From Swiss-Prot:
It comes from Kluyveromyces lactis (strain ATCC 8585 / CBS 2359 / DSM 70799 / NBRC 1267 / NRRL Y-1140 / WM37) (Yeast). The gene is VPS27. Zn(2+) 2 binds at residues 193, 196, 223, 226. Residues 20-151 form the VHS domain. It is found in: Endosome membrane. Residues 281-294, 547-561 have a biased composition (Basic and acidic residues). This is Vacuolar protein sorting-associated protein 27. InterPro entries: ENTH_VHS, HGS/VPS27, UIM_dom, VHS_dom, Vps27_GAT-like, Znf_FYVE, Znf_FYVE-rel, Znf_FYVE_PHD.
Amino acid sequence: MALPSMSVSEFDALIEQCTNEKIPNGEIDLSAALELSDMIRSRRLPPKDAMRCLKKRVLQTRNNQNLQFSVWRLVEVCMKNGGVPFLKEVCSREFMDCLEQVILAESTDYELEQFCSRLVGELYLAFKNDSQLSYVVKVYQKLVSRGIDMENLKPTENLNAMFDAKTPADWIDSDACMICSTQFTLLNRKHHCRSCGGVFCQLHSSKFIPLPDLGIFEPVRVCDNCFEDYDLKRKSSKGKKSKGKKRFTRSEDDDEDLRRAIELSLKENGRDADTFIPDTAKLEPLKKDPDEEDPDLKAAIEASLREHQQEEMRRKSQAKNMYNTSSPSVAPPIENNYDLSSNEEEDIHLFASLVERMKTQPPTAVLEDTQLQQLYQKVLGVRPKLNYALSDTVSKYNTVYEMNSKISDIMNMYDSMLEMQLRNISLSQQYAIPESGRNSYGYHQNMPQYDQPNSPQIIAQPQIHSPQQNERTILNYASPVSQHLSNGATTNTYQQGSALQNQQPAAPEPQPVSFEKPSTTSQLEGLILEEPSEPPYPDENTTIENPKIEQASERPYPDDHLKQENITSFDFPTVPLRKLSIHGSEQEVKEEPVQQEQLLIEL
């Protein structure tokens, strides 16, 4: 039974699941990471493809320090559990150059830099004598020359065991079975053992068992020899279990003796019998699966757990140090070692002053001056630090300059948005609807009403005119629209309105007026069809008498020889005041013009 192969896209999806953004503090999904390392170790995906998938994930998360940290944690788990073929790909130039760039990058977090440098140091200590992995030594020496601190790493005894993960052996090709030496034919086919990689016939390779130490948890084909080896390991693990049970019974007896000694001591001291005596609970031995009885697997698990505990202790100590300090930053601040001390500054100033003095002296004096030579050696040692400080200052200046340009762009955008909003507000106020109480037209609104066209009756109501209304009324009274009305009707209306105004003794109290928006069509129709209102400036001293209306049956038109005195001096044709009778029996009304006084317009 062959193992199912895995595609690169599926492997990328598993990597994203292990390094999910929702996992805080740069942690990983440990169960998914171990499953991923088992897939690499069982060669369901070629080691080179697995290495390139991890490198691609590192380059994708370059701008996110949290995800970058989780990806490198996953790389560490795969390195220590993926086997030697994957380690060879990790220690190649293609992957180690990426690791070196992450360590030397200025934007790398301090904690991430320390973690990656620790990975390089562990690889160096484990494989510095291996000729196939010699590129790790070159990267280590290059980082040390660049000033990366590698002195904290100490060689441990179990360092080689951390990278010693058992992997399936390479398949061997042969023409005969490696147990019975039977030649393979068309009917007797050959089969490979997934544990040792040998070639066997169907008779000697018919067993199927899982291989958890190789990262294979599904039953696969093994030969008879490998099956017997796994069977012996299971039996030996059962014997260890029985010994563990005996030791457990001895520990229970010791607890019982301790309990009795406590009871006797309490009785001797005169304590009451009701005193609480702690009862030791009997622990049941845990049942372990036979797959977990492999000593190599146990050693690998213990090493990984021990490393995980050390990592947790280190993180807790860093968290305590972070909370004890007054700085609110999450990561510890990077110490700037480029600052010059006071002694170095004094040496530089002293060297400069001595050089100025030596300009006037002969060259032999310069060579004989030992103090100048010593200062020269000191200044040469300070020169790299000055260069680093200068480059650091330039990089900070560029960063601040970019931030300042971004802020200025944002402020310009914000100002343009504010100007646009203010412009919209001014336009909305400019084109707003005028007040409903204000009359946009200059016509006099107090128009008389008629009940019937044949018998006109004027209902005059008391009004209080303001100066503005009087001025507007005067101007409207002289408009060309009002001149289309007949002279007799104008005189009659004016006389009746003045008579009603004289009859009222006093003006009533003003009533609230409801303002409505005027209609242009209705006002024009009222001005043409209806009679105009009374003039606002009558003569108080002159009393106008009502003229006598004479019925003239001969002519329906008013006298043409009489000239009316109006505000303007234009003469317009007159219109019949009433409908002409057919038989000529009706009498016509003869009206006499009344002399009106010219109105004064206030300027």
